[in-house]
Amino acid sequence: MSDVMTANRRSFLAEDGKETIVRTDDLVRDFDLGHRPEGGRLVLRAVDKVSLTIRRGETLGLVGESGSGKSTIGRMLVGLLPYTSGNIELFGQKIEPRAKAAAWKPLRRRVQFVFQDPHAALNPRMRVGTAIAEPLDVAGNLTRKERSARVDELMELVGLPTSFARRFPHEFSGGQRQRIVIARALALNPEILVCDEAVASLDVSMQAQIVNLLKDLQDQLGLSYLFIAHDLAVVRAVSHRVAVLYAGQIVETGPRTALYSDPLHPYSRALLDSVPRARRGAPRSIIAGEVPSLLNKPKGCAFCPRCPKAMDICRDVPPPLRVIGDREVACHLY
């Protein structure tokens, strides 16, 4: 067995009996920005000791403001970025921090990534049937006839006519292009899709269609999703559990219904209160202040400078992630 990936044969089961197929423990990602003028290295910690789990057949929504580290976590989970320290386990296999491509190869089929911008994700000179077949060509285990049949199957699966296979990306709408990207991600029958702002570039009606498609695919194929988004309404529509990220740290996780109806962390509550209401005249809260610089975070709780409930201890002591019923929350109020 490779010295950069070791097998861990524990069977991770949640209390509800569902297998945990993704686990991160104290996951850290640092970016070295070079030398400080006064000496030493300038290091930006984009992800700070993040612990998450994803169970088989569920969707974990990952929310937070821009720059909170959401996309960085997603890219580490599919091997697009190495992690600095901590632990990643996929299907019971531990991924070493600087694992090479060869170490990731057995997992490539099982974990796929859906990018935010479907236009940028598709080669404009490549017919969409060829684009969808790219993973099949890399795997190289199908005949030409089998490859063509699989492309047709994938296009039907995402709601596109098979006759569209010979068209080019510019001939499609944004929503149709995202369906093509999803079809390509499904080519090798993955078990997990990491969806990084997968509907952010679409209008509201197209967003609803893609969300419904993802839910239908989950029901049909038993997929698990890490659904990364800043739009809380979309996350609510698609997720079973939600994790709230702030300045690279998890501040709260829990079942969708509980977290949306009664958020425990002040940041979770402020984030939900900032969402515009459909009712005319409904009050809307704005989170005061700015997200702290990841190069100079507060000594204690990262949210302390913006928190209306901050106490003295918050300024000096980082709050641990505590289990509160069916949730975890990092706050000195609990």
From Swiss-Prot:
Disulfide bridges in this chain: none
Signal peptide: none
Record keyword Transport present: yes
Record keywords: ATP-binding, Cell inner membrane, Cell membrane, Membrane, Nucleotide-binding, Peptide transport, Protein transport, Translocase, Transport
Annotated transmembrane regions: none
PROSITE patterns per UniProt: ABC_TRANSPORTER_1, ABC_TRANSPORTER_2
EC number(s) from the headed UniProt entry: 7.4.2.-
GO CC annotation terms, alphabetical: plasma membrane
Enzymatic class: translocase
Location(s) in or outside the cell: Cell inner membrane
One MF term in the entry's GO annotations: ATP hydrolysis activity
Subunit annotation: The complex is composed of two ATP-binding proteins (BAB2_1052 and BAB2_1053), two transmembrane proteins (BAB2_1050 and BAB2_1051) and a solute-binding protein (BAB2_1049).
Function in brief: Probably part of an ABC transporter complex that could be involved in peptide import. Probably responsible for energy coupling to the transport system.
Assigned protein family: Belongs to the ABC transporter superfamily.
Entry-linked PANTHER family: D,D-DIPEPTIDE TRANSPORT ATP-BINDING PROTEIN DDPF-RELATED (PTHR43776:SF7), TRANSPORT ATP-BINDING PROTEIN (PTHR43776)
Protein known as: Putative peptide import ATP-binding protein BAB2_1053
